[in-house]
């Protein structure tokens, strides 16, 4: 099950210069040296894994697996932005190793504090609820990275204007998917206002999310909300 999301994502996918695929214990990512953060982070979350066994480690640190070196403390300190998790720490609380690895800077992105602690957190909580209801979900999440973004820190970490999530329930008889795109700012409206089709997420990110699925199923999942 843990490799399912990797299969769905990686089939037919290629990495560009300055990008690196990294696989950690509980999640995988595609790191962008240009933007000093992940283009996407992907993981499976099961019902059992929503039961927290470990507390937050808060040991923010560079990712030793990033060959070009990742962002670090100096990029975020005093910037006014939160070190926003892409794969949430709360989704990794089932394992001490997974929890610790969720604090790698390769899993961080500069987020408006009101956004990170507000609607983004609520969406993360909603996804955990879906994992309980549907037994497991496949999650892909990340920033929308473009060439015109402002930057912070010595490593020039890009500040995304938008973030996305794509959630997939691929179990037989219950095949469904939903996407979300949200601005990196304080948001007062309900989560449902930002629900979109996977096709819409693909258009704004340029990522082909479910290339490993059969074409007919991929089209069905991506075109419907």
Outline where the language-model segments fall.
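N-terminal capping/interface segment
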Residues: 2-3, 19
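Sec-dependent N-terminal signal peptides
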Residues: 3-13
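Sec/Tat signal peptide C-region and signal peptidase I cleavage site
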Residues: 14-18
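Short, His- and charge-rich active-site/binding loops that engage polyanionic ligands
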Residues: 20-82
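Domain-level detector of nuclease and nuclease-like folds
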Residues: 66-225
């Amino acid at each position: 099950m843990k490799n399912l999301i990797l299969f769905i994502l990686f089939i037919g996918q290629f990495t560009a210069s300055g990008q690196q695929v990294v696989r950690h214990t509980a999640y995988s990512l595609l790191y962008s040296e240009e933007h000093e953060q992940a283009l996407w982070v992907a993981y499976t979350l099961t019902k059992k894994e929503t039961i927290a066994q470990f507390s937050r480690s808060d040991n923010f640190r560079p990712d030793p697996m990033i060959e070009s070196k990742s962002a670090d403390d100096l990029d975020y300190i005093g910037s006014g932005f939160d070190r926003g998790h892409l794969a949430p720490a709360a989704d990794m609380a089932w394992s001490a190793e997974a929890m610790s690895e969720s604090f790698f800077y390769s899993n961080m992105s500069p987020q408006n504090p009101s956004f990170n602690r507000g609607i983004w957190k609520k969406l993360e909580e909603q996804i955990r609820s879906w994992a309980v209801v549907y037994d497991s979900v496949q999650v892909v999440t990340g920033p929308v990275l473009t060439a015109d973004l402002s930057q912070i820190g010595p490593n020039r970490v890009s500040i995304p204007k938008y973030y996305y999530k794509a959630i997939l329930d691929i179990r037989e008889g219950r095949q469904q998917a939903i996407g979300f795109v949200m601005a990196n700012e304080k948001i007062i409206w309900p989560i449902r206002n930002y629900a979109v089709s996977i096709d819409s997420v693909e258009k704004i990110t340029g990522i082909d999310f479910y290339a490993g699925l059969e074409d007919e199923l991929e089209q069905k999942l991506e075109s419907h909300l």
